[in-house]
UniProtKB/Swiss-Prot annotation:
Range of residues in the leader sequence: 1-19
Descriptive protein name: Cytochrome c1
Species of origin: Allochromatium vinosum (strain ATCC 17899 / DSM 180 / NBRC 103801 / NCIMB 10441 / D) (Chromatium vinosum)
PTMs per UniProt: Binds 1 heme c group covalently per subunit.
Lineage: Bacteria, Pseudomonadati, Pseudomonadota, Gammaproteobacteria, Chromatiales
Cited Pfam families: Cytochrom_C1 (PF02167)
Function: Component of the ubiquinol-cytochrome c reductase complex (complex III or cytochrome b-c1 complex), which is a respiratory chain that generates an electrochemical potential coupled to ATP synthesis. c1 functions as an electron donor to cytochrome c.
First-listed, main subcellular location of the protein, grouped into a coarse class: membrane
Compartment(s): Cell membrane
Keywords, sorted A to Z: Cell membrane, Electron transport, Heme, Iron, Membrane, Metal-binding, Respiratory chain, Signal, Transmembrane, Transmembrane helix, Transport
Gene Ontology cellular component terms for the protein in this record: plasma membrane
Disulphide bonds in the chain: none
Binding annotation for heme c: C50, C53, H54
Membrane-traversing stretches: 220-240
Length: 244
């Protein structure tokens, strides 16, 4: 029994540690993968603001268009840039050499970002930039301290400052309690929240395009297993009726 308990603990402990994260407060993204309009807007925002530096190297344009209900004309007009073709993988415009020169690091591919982080993390991250004159691009991030990227949505969100909380220990450093808007951007806070939610929704879809289909098929699988259980139970009763 002890070995069974120990084995169960060893299996579940890594999952619990990953789920706990770093203890930061995350806002709920409240995404809906069934909201096709949100997914379409998120795809548009990602292509316009993110693909300069980030790729979705496991996703093709035509697969995205098929899943999100985007016809070829709209795909070519709104999502394809440069020499990109519908059958191409979604790559970034920037070369790795240029990325190293400008940022000191190659920006990560974002296909699986909501799976190895979480949708709530991505949503909160995009809302957590604040002014910091000590950083190369003048901004920092509450969730990702010393972030190396500029706030590409800053003109839309506006400028935020960090809200500091004094340390409760003598000689301790103040900590960041949150952020506050000090200069309005091109969008209202509500409009920016919706935009960030759409981007998060799209990235969640990109991380697992089959998720909705998997859930749909899963319901039939559970019904089949339930029916199979009933048959197995009736068969068991038939086999054992003479014994009892």
């Amino acid at each position: 029994m002890r070995k069974l308990i120990l084995a169960t603990f060893l299996l579940l402990a890594p999952t619990a540690l990953l789920a706990s994260g770093g203890g930061e407060h995350l806002e709920s993204a409240n995404i809906d993968l069934r909201d096709q309009a949100s997914l379409q807007r998120g795809a548009k925002y990602f292509m316009n603001y993110c693909t300069g530096c980030h790729s979705l190297q496991y996703m093709r344009y035509n697969r995205l268009a098929k899943d999100l209900g985007i016809d070829e004309i709209a795909l070519r007009q709104n999502l394809l840039f440069g020499d990109a073709k519908p059958g191409d993988l979604i790559t970034k415009a920037m070369t790795d050499d240029d990325a190293l020169k400008w940022f000191g690091v190659v920006p990560p591919d974002l296909t699986l970002v909501t799976r190895w982080r979480s949708p709530d993390w991505v949503y909160t991250y995009l809302k957590s930039f604040y002014l910091d004159d000590t950083r190369p691009y003048g901004v920092n991030n509450v969730l990702f301290p010393l972030v190396g990227m500029p706030h590409v949505l800053g003109d839309l969100q506006g400028r935020q400052e960090a809200v500091m909380e004094p340390s409760h220990e003598p000689g301790g450093e103040p900590t960041i309690k949150g952020v506050k808007l000090v200069e309005e951007g091109g969008l209202s806070p509500q409009e920016y929240d919706t935009m960030v939610r759409d981007i998060t929704n799209f990235l969640t879809y990109a991380g697992e395009p089959f998720q909705l289909e998997r859930e749909r098929i899963g319901r039939y699988v559970l019904l089949f297993l339930g029916f199979l259980f009933i048959l197995a139970y009736l068969l068991k009763k038939e086999y054992w009726k003479d014994v009892h």
